[in-house]
Amino acid sequence: MSNVIENLGKLDRKVTLAIPKAEVQKETQERLARLSKTVKMSGFRPGKVPMKMVEKQYGQQVEFEVRFDKAARKFFDITQAQEVKVAGQPKFDIKTEGVADDELAFEATFEVYPEVKIGDLASAEVTRTKTEIGDAEIDKTVDILRKQRVHFHARGDAGAHGDGGADVAAQNGDRVTLDFVGKIDGVEFAGGKAEDFVYVLGEGRMLPEFETATLGLKVGESKSFPLTFPADYHGKEVAGKTAEFTVTLKKVEWAHLPEVDDAFAKSLGIADGSVEKMRADIRENLEREVKRRTHSMLKDQVMEALLKVSELDVPKALVEQDQERLVEMARRDLEQRGMPNAKDMPIPAEMFTQQAERRVKLGLILAEIVKANGLEAKPDQIKAEIEDFAKSYEDPKEVMRWYYGDQQRLAEMEAYVLENNVVNFVCDKAKVADKTVSFEELTAAPAQA
């Protein structure tokens, strides 16, 4: 049954490919003849190696390549002629039974793309998150920016910013410099001793018992106290054990936050020092972050809704291909993090089975919904998105050139626009419930890709 595609199941197919031996022999000889012109062998000049020696050395390998090249070409011709959409790569096996003497036969097993049924989008439920940016959010951001530019001054010292008050004892928010030594059963341990150690009280950098013991100390004072390390402490050699610590305070400095004035605005890149312009820029940046996060959350909601209302079988070949991509992505990530031997590290593909299945499913669903509803990314849409992105930069035209000068970056923006088209299309048809959350709640939620 040469050239007839057999149905082996939902997506599995098989076709027998018959190839005349004469064709294989003819092409093998042609390839060997071309090879003989460049092959190098000891004792012969390039191109002067006898054909018999070339055949002996390379004949079997070349014939093997010709067989499978012809099988692949024949497979492509048959599936294309019958308009069969092949998913992934076919598997070729040599067939030996029931084959004519003057032919070679292969059995190609493969999968086809599934039929994708998109259900009733009107029944899909999507939550659309909304967040408003007001003065309170801008004020909080200004406070964060002030804390990032904090200056510390010694308590009790008079100066341009005062002395931080008459109380020279260490308080939460103060930066302290101290020496400490810890012992377990009277013996010092690794990491339990330091000189001129600096940290800010109340930020949670140290264990609570350590910070509590430091509070209220004045310069020159010492204090001894017991400290029990948590059972899950990162230092396994001391986890769950009790140490006796002694701390000696050497310096206490209070935090001076810069005033919100023209000098502060200039430090943030506002050329004329306008506080009003600074706040406007902060609002714009916060609104951009809100747009990014809410769009990502909405996209995730839409994708989940599409998965729920769609029916399709998933080709194993595509899942396996995506597993390989995810393994390589994980390996590159480990390399970037400085993991030694990341290139050779064994990463089981099975770790990514569920993720790959979901990605393949969504890819097939999106392709179907885009094709059926004409949701392809239009050039003017892509340009509008790039222009919107470029507005936040000093030289928008340079950003535009940067995007249009690289096909990969342009393809990424095209994919983004296409996803937007799908999201908008689904939201127009689905049951959409708006949910308003604060900026703090929005940023506390896990960021979506």
From Swiss-Prot:
One Gene Ontology MF term: peptidyl-prolyl cis-trans isomerase activity
Subcellular location: Cytoplasm
Keyword set includes Cell cycle: yes
Catalysis performed (reactions): [protein]-peptidylproline (omega=180) = [protein]-peptidylproline (omega=0)
The protein's Enzyme Commission number: 5.2.1.8
Domain of life: Bacteria
Keywords associated with the record: Cell cycle, Cell division, Chaperone, Cytoplasm, Isomerase, Rotamase
Cross-referenced InterPro entries: PPIase_dom_sf, PPIase_FKBP_dom, Trig_fac, Trigger_fac_C, Trigger_fac_C_sf, Trigger_fac_ribosome-bd_bac, Trigger_fac_ribosome-bd_sf, Trigger_fact/SurA_dom_sf
NCBIfam families: tig (TIGR00115)
Family to which the UniProt record says this protein belongs: Belongs to the FKBP-type PPIase family. Tig subfamily.
Protein name according to UniProt: Trigger factor
Organism: Cupriavidus metallidurans (strain ATCC 43123 / DSM 2839 / NBRC 102507 / CH34)
The gene coding this protein: tig
